[in-house]
Curated annotation (Swiss-Prot):
Keywords: Amino-acid biosynthesis, Cytoplasm, Diaminopimelate biosynthesis, Lyase, Lysine biosynthesis, Schiff base. Catalyzes the condensation of (S)-aspartate-beta-semialdehyde [(S)-ASA] and pyruvate to 4-hydroxy-tetrahydrodipicolinate (HTPA). This is 4-hydroxy-tetrahydrodipicolinate synthase. It comes from the Bacteria.
Length: 290
């Protein structure tokens, strides 16, 4: 699976999960053959209770989607992460995205033991999540090397922003599946060995993102994608993408849970401009890919 969408979690005005919008989003990904990642940072996982998260996983599984469903595993405590993995394995999910421990900044041995402890209780393929901007430390090369023989260590989502680190991961473990975790870096990371993209923008443009992944070296594609990335990065993810989804009526409301707020999005006037640009690009892609 080359493209996985880091799915948002839509909310109603009372801050309950908007399951109708969830269904709409997931079916839009299924239509294009894109897998989904639930309850990552884009899905505001830290703002949801365990009960809410389980309801979301159960609902997604009830839709009988013909695409992979990957579930995020929190990096807050080993007990919480282990209990969550055990709970999710009672549902027909396809794998896990395991976050590097946040805030504590462990050393190499602590990080190895953290991931190994979680991998040892799963019976699904797992993608380790390198996100130093949130975790405070990267996934070390020594960690990748030490875990490379684990049967459920499937890949890494690399959101570290370093092309060199992506190349190093592939050198340390050539059989590992590296997923680019930054929409704008897909062409460069693909050249360095990344085999897939875990995308935020594909929430709003699942078909266009699919084409972007298939044709990463088209200059026009990458320029537009970088413009979109620049826009969504003006605020903390997923503020911008929720605003875009609501503008396009892909979700009912642009509501986030605190401490995230839609009020931190300053430039909503650019929304129709970006939508029009993407519409024009989509028409060009339609001619190329058909």
């Amino acid at each position: 699976m080359k493209l996985l969408t880091a799915s948002v979690t839509p909310f109603l005005p009372n801050y309950d999960i908007d399951f109708l919008s969830v269904e709409k989003l997931l079916h839009s990904q299924e239509k294009e053959g894109n897998g989904v990642v639930l309850l990552g940072s884009t899905g505001e996982s830290l703002a949801l209770t365990v009960q809410e998260k389980e309801k979301l996983v159960a609902y997604a599984c009830s839709l009988d989607l013909k695409i992979p469903i990957i579930v995020g595993v929190p990096g807050t405590s080993l007990h919480e992460a282990s209990a969550w993995v055990s709970l999710c394995q009672s549902y027909p999910v396809d794998g896990f995205l395991i976050t590097s421990p946040i805030y504590t900044k462990p050393g190499i041995q602590g990080q190895i033991l953290w991931f190994e402890s979680i991998l040892n209780i799963t019976n699904k393929p797992a993608i380790l999540y390198n996100i130093p901007s949130r975790a405070g430390s990267p996934i070390y090369l020594e960690t990748v090397r030490a875990l490379s023989g684990h049967p459920f260590f499937y890949g890494i989502k690399d959101s570290g922003g370093s092309i060199d680190r992506c190349r190093e991961y592939t050198q340390v473990c050539p059989n590992l599946i590296i997923y680019c975790g930054d929409d704008g870096l897909w062409p460069q990371m693909h050249q360095c060995g990344a085999r897939g993209l875990i995308s935020v923008l594909s929430n709003s443009w699942p078909k266009e993102a699919h084409n972007y992944v298939e044709d990463p070296f088209n200059k026009n594609n990458s320029l537009l994608w970088c413009e979109l990335v620049s826009w969504i990065n003006q605020t903390t993810n997923p503020i911008s993408i929720k605003a875009m989804l609501a503008y396009k009526q892909d979700i009912a409301y642009d509501i986030l849970r605190l401490p995230l707020s839609i009020k931190d999005l300053q430039n909503k006037k650019v929304l129709p401009v970006l939508v029009e640009k993407m519409s024009q690009w989509s028409q060009i892609c339609e001619c190329v890919f058909t």
